[in-house]
Every structure is written in C-alpha cells, then in structure tokens.
Amino acid sequence: DMTGVTGAVIAEVDEKFQPVKGTEQFIECDTIGIAVGLTPDIALPSMADVTFVNAGRLGSQVPMHDRNMETTKEGIYVAGDSSGVEEASSAIEEGKLAGIAAAEALGKVDAKAAKEAKAQVWDSLNQLRTGPFGAGRHDAKEKIIEEMEEWKVKNNAC
C-alpha cells in the first residue's frame, strides 16, 4: 500500500462542523476521498451585498433567501453551495427552483405554470431532505425562509 492509509476516524459534527466527543468510529479503508464542499461558496452573493444569516447545519453564513431562492436583493437568486452545503441532488433542484422563479419574474413563464413547476421541485427537495441528516437540513432551510419573511416585513419588501 503506497498511500499509508489504513483507516479513518469519523465522527458526528456540531453546527460549527466540530467533532462531537464520544461519537468517533474507526473504519478500515485504504483510500479517503472528499466529494462535497464543507463550507458555502458565498463569493458571488457577497459581491451583491445580500443579507446573510447563520444556517448552522448548512455551513455557517449563507444568503438569506425566500422559497423561490431570491435573496434580499431583488432579482438575485442563490442555489446549491451558495445557499448552503447539502448534496448535488439538492443543488440541482434548487437551481431549477431559482430558474423557474427568475423566468416567472421576467415574464417568461406564466404564474400558473410556474406555481405547478415549483411545487414539483419542492416535493423533490422535501423528499431529499428526510432521514437523520436530511431532516436537519430541512429545518435549517425552513429557518432561513422564515427569517427572510420577517426581513421582508421589517423592510417593507414584498
């Protein structure tokens, strides 16, 4: 074995991605690969000067956004790792949601068709956000959306 890898210690992490003591487990393996981001990619939303919120399980600070993935800056949408770290399937679905919402805002899709398409995407996202890990992501996303609604009321933005 040229890598010298004989195993890995895995552990649960808290909302700051720090290991939770007592949850460590050793797994025998000869290769370790990382295939997902561990922190949100917020460079572009930062340039747009959107409002950020602490999303905990989604990787710390992320842009505040509504159910259509629109941020506090009208016409600026986020999806995938820019809206919080999840998984590729969720990122794809969020991209669809943002695209549908943007097309609707531009008058390229009528409201009824957009509503139906967004409902299908939300059904898919809700299915992806189940189970022991998905439920936490679901709750974190709902909290972001709630905070966005509060922000809209406070800032007279609708």
Briefly describe each language-model feature range.
Residues 1-158:
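Residues forming the flavin
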